[in-house]
């Protein structure tokens, strides 16, 4: 603490360089987070979900860490299988991939970790060959990425959803136009076995030439049908703008089948509307959408017909400042929350302002983020944390999981070590 006070004096009197100032404020942020300890969310805002917001605690844990200059773990998301862990606890399955940092978005096949004691212990990351790369005769590698796992109670299976991706033999993505599709894989907990990943067949190969459900939260309805947010572009479309929709699908425990899709939401601003995430709250469906310039939201009564999209803004009228990255939902029985990154948090040194991770309550009628409820869930340590997941684990816990993407290299002295974090929100 004494050294921090000395540093504060040096900040005030201009004796520190820019990098030292950045590190100083990160130290302050981390200490503030630790001292806060238990994060509480309460407000008397009369518009806040028409009820008092729930108190909650946040327990921040490191699941695993890895950084060797070649890869870090990324796209870490977790799903809960009820009742088959120790003493009736759920079994947690975390899916993640290696990001080979020499290339942009260059990911391994899928790995999984497992916990039967609510995260007290985890198995080591296990490569799953059925979820790995497939090598074609033309030296092209086809993989799957941006996976979100979830439990399908009617069939007793875990379903992992994402999309396909193409890589060069020597590394890196193939950027020329190729068909992309929603990919899925099935885990049978009784056999402790993954089936080989498959691709969802769409009704129009031309229209949905470049489509997928990357990084999105999806829903299982009471009748077992799935609502899967997806984004797409037609073949030969050079607009650099995706459209988003919600796919209505059936699942028999082995095969995922398209049935219909809702309104197609478009926006003629690079790169359109993509990486949508879906949730349901009090019988209404909420969709948050990524755009390069700002984030958008819309609502529906049937997941087919949607209100006009609107930018995400705080209840004070200012835009929340989330851009060119995803947002996700956290749902309490009495309250709807948004998890996001944003600019304006002393984080200009982070590409796309992709850290820290914030959570705040949402007014579900006005579609506003309640600024006074905003909290930092996972502090930033100089690197990006954009590819995160939010999962309902039990009625009492929701988890936000993310791996530190060790980029940019000039910030690697600011505390990041390739940790995969789990922020346990305890309601």
Show where each model-derived region lies:
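Conserved beta-strand position repeated once per blade in WD40 beta-propeller domains
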Residues: 75-77, 146-148, 215-217, 275-277, ...
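Beta-rich carbohydrate-recognition and catalytic domains
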Residues: 42-72, 80-142, 151-211, 219-275, ...
